[in-house]
Amino acid sequence: MRAFLRNQKYEDMHNIIHILQIRKLRHRLSNFPRLPGILAPETVLLPFCYKVFRKKEKVKRSQKATEFIDYSIEQSHHAILTPLQTHLTMKGSSMKCSSLSSEAILFTLTLQLTQTLGLECCLLYLSKTIHPQII
């Protein structure tokens, strides 16, 4: 069972890193305050990443191009808090065996999100703090 959970965590972490690499984000260029609190596990963050980053295909003449579009381009980062809170509340209620409470995760993510410039920055910051030795 432990091996399965360890493999699942690695797979989730790999997916987050892949999303961030697709967006061509560079973690060395970002400078964020180190906030105290409980960091969200990657299994909580991953589904929200997929809601935020969507794949849109555009057809230009005879050429087909794939672009990654950010849902939040026209919104302030504060507007992102509502869907994030909804997602974490639903995810937290399904995490019966977790030692982290959804309220603690939500509080920490809210702090991190409101102190960064945008959602991409928030996701990047969280990925750095979840697995700093890998990224």
Swiss-Prot record:
It is found in: Cytoplasm; Nucleus. The keyword Nucleus applies. Its main location: cytoplasm. One of its GO terms (cellular component) is cytosol. Expressed in colon, prostate, small intestine, testis and spleen, with lower expression in thymus, ovary, and peripheral blood leukocytes. Up-regulated expression in prostate, breast, and bladder cancer, but not in lung and colon cancer. The keyword Ligase does not apply. Keywords: Cytoplasm, Nucleus. This is Prostate and breast cancer overexpressed gene 1 protein. It comes from Homo sapiens (Human). The gene is PBOV1.
